[in-house]
Amino acid sequence: MAGKNQSQKKKKSTAPMGNGQPVNQLCQLLGAMIKSQRQQPRGGQAKKKKPEKPHFPLAAEDDIRHHLTQTERSLCLQSIQTAFNQGAGTASLSSSGKVSFQVEFMLPVAHTVRLIRVTSTSASQGAS
């Protein structure tokens, strides 16, 4: 009887590790993880994609939206929404059913200065 208890204890101590999952399942999982990592390009080898620059197909050529950075676009949208929600600007409805909303706001000085420089250089390049 004593021999039987010892062999049972040995079987328990050699039980698969990994929170009760059989070793086979753990190996399959590890293999799948390695396979998926091989399919993904490594950090140093991958070409970093630039975020796609939004285009404004309905905007005129001289529209400043073509020159806005992502931060500036976000600031503009936030300012427009805040102005609308607080009742700033002018909102109207035409007889044809078109809604119009017009508002003026200022961006932070650094962004304004950058936009003035960018738009003035593009305007002077267009003139020459």
UniProtKB/Swiss-Prot annotation:
For the region Disordered, give the residue spans: 1-60
An example Gene Ontology biological process:
symbiont-mediated suppression of host cytoplasmic pattern recognition receptor signaling pathway via inhibition of IRF3 activity
Alphabetically sorted, this entry's keywords are: Host cytoplasm, Host nucleus, Host-virus interaction, Inhibition of host innate immune response by virus, Inhibition of host IRF3 by virus, Inhibition of host RLR pathway by virus, Ribonucleoprotein, RNA-binding, Viral immunoevasion, Viral nucleoprotein, Virion
Alphabetized Pfam families for the sequence:
Arteri_nucleo
One cellular component GO annotation, for this chain's record?
Answer: host cell cytoplasm
Q: What is its main location?
A: virion
Any idea where this protein resides? Virion; Host cytoplasm; Host nucleus
- Has the keyword Lyase been applied to this entry? no
Q: Does the keyword rRNA-binding apply?
A: no
Q: Name one GO molecular function term.
A: RNA binding
Q: Which InterPro entries match?
A: Arte_nucleocap, Nucleocapsid_C
What the protein does? Multifunctional protein which associates with itself through both covalent and non-covalent interactions to provide the basis for viral assembly. May play a role in the regulation of cellular gene expression during infection by interacting with host HIC. Plays a role in the inhibition of the dsRNA-mediated IFN induction pathway by inhibiting host IRF3 phosphorylation and nuclear translocation.
Q: What family does this chain come from, according to its entry?
A: Belongs to the arteriviridae nucleocapsid family.
Quaternary arrangement and interactors, per the entry?
Answer: Homooligomer. Interacts with host PABPC1 (via C-terminus). Interacts with host HIC; this interaction may regulate the expression of different cellular genes.
The protein's name: Nucleoprotein
Origin organism is: Porcine reproductive and respiratory syndrome virus (strain Lelystad) (PRRSV)
Encoding gene, per UniProt annotation:
N
